[in-house]
Amino acid sequence: MNTYKEHYNLCKKTFQESCASGYNDVYDLRLDQEIFEKDEKYLTLVKKIAEQVHNKLNNKQDVLENQWATHLNGWRDIPELDELFSTIMPEIEKKVFKSNAQIEILHCYRNKPDVNPDSSWLWHYDDCPDQFLKLVIYLTDVTEDNGCFQYLQNSSGEFPMVPTNRTHPRHDGQPFFFKGKRIPPEETQNRINEGYSINSLVGNAGTYALMHPNIYHRATVPSTGSTPRECLFFFIRPALTKRKSYSEGISSIIPERNVKRYQLD
């Protein structure tokens, strides 16, 4: 077992809890906002998590600053996160992965207003292995003015996606389909000319999207006077065995690590 594909095939063979969902496995998903219910339990957990994250960010409590965002590194002592993981992960496993799954990385941050768009704030793809999924959960109400996530989609529900060369943990992804994993403006415009349109993920706290990391997407910059978006970003991959806790083995923003690869278990 040397490749991500071989690993995932084995993960699926050892899993007994799959359910009908419209997805055969992770390869079918592009972006979905209905994998798990936004019920009272879920929204209550999000609210409690959001309050603690907001206070920690305001108090600069174990944070990492960069040009575009304030990242909370110290989220592990928020008890409701473990309950949130236990609520949503079984649904993601049964309906999409059709295998056990591991939250490999969790980034928790607040966007900064009025910065020059760069990095993730330009149209890009993450160049992750095809077996990786990304989940964003908003902790605040998000509009098109305060840092929403955007993606391309057409009227048939199709999403343009960039292929990756990352087939095993030692592969660095080169050659990249687009230099620096940034999608040139003319390429985005070509997709728009083909009938794709820019869609904004907006909504109240608790709004989420589970997506393939290699679809065309970008973050946006909060405008002056807005309340910047605060959110959780998960990177989730298949796992051979069920963890005792979904909190087990998750990396945060520190120490820095490559979000585009994972080790085979």
Report the location of each language-model feature.
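Short, conserved beta-strand element in jelly-roll/cupin
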Residues: 128-144, 202-205, 210, 235-239
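Extracellular structured ligand-interaction cores
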Residues: 26, 130-136, 146, 198-200, ...
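Histidine-centered catalytic micro-motifs
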Residues: 120-128, 215-219
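Double-stranded beta-helix
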Residues: 146-215
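Non-heme Fe(II)/2-oxoglutarate
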Residues: 5-8, 12-13, 45-48, 54-57, ...
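Non-heme Fe(II)-dependent double-stranded beta-helix
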Residues: 1-121
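Active-site region of the double-stranded beta-helix
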Residues: 99-103, 124-128, 139-148, 154-156
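Short edge-strand/loop segments of extracellular domains
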Residues: 112-113, 152-159, 235-241
